[in-house]
């Protein structure tokens, strides 16, 4: 990718409209603080460009392979801004809560919820779901979500996606684009995760690159 192209792309990258630059923490006596404005940088810009190009080429799925430290969750948040409804799937609640904060920072939106444990939000623009909950077939129906409810789906730690619960989610929903994130694409059981993303890897980078 030409460096000038990336610079131009970075300059033209726009966030969604911001209604307010202030927000209140979810504490009764918390002070109102200025929310930082987050922008993509470095390898994230290259990855965003690659993802946009692969969608222009007609791809509906893609895998980004990047080492820990590159900022894959923020990358997904930046890439999601053109899509209205987003689903982020992970296997740990801690990851989901961290991801929610990242997406909130980038999209400047409090219209998000969780689908995990006892919490079953179904009417938000951003849903952060545990695979253990959403991956159950009892939740994959029109009572909870229409097949096309989400425009953009992120599967964190995509190397786990060959498991049955991840498969249930991937097979049920019909998003405009599905993004897989991983630092470790190889699995010891030799199951092929590349097949799940149509063998499309728009971007990969190691931490030292």
Q: Language-model features: where?
A:
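Post-DEXD/H (motif II) to motif III coupling segment of the RecA-like Helicase ATP-binding lobe
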Residues: 159-209
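ATP-dependent helicase/translocase motor core
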Residues: 1-67, 74-86, 101-105, 123, ...
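Conserved Walker B
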Residues: 150-153, 157-159
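Conserved nucleotide-binding/hydrolysis micro-motifs of P-loop NTPases
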Residues: 93-95, 120, 132-135, 159-160, ...
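Local beta-strand N-terminus motif with an aromatic residue
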Residues: 124, 150-151, 175, 197
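Conserved helix-turn-beta segment of the N-terminal RecA-like "Helicase ATP-binding" lobe
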Residues: 86, 93-119
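Conserved phosphate-coupling serine/threonine residues in phosphotransfer and NTP-handling enzymes
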Residues: 68-70, 182
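Conserved helix/coil segment N-terminal to the catalytic DExD/H
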Residues: 117-149, 163-168
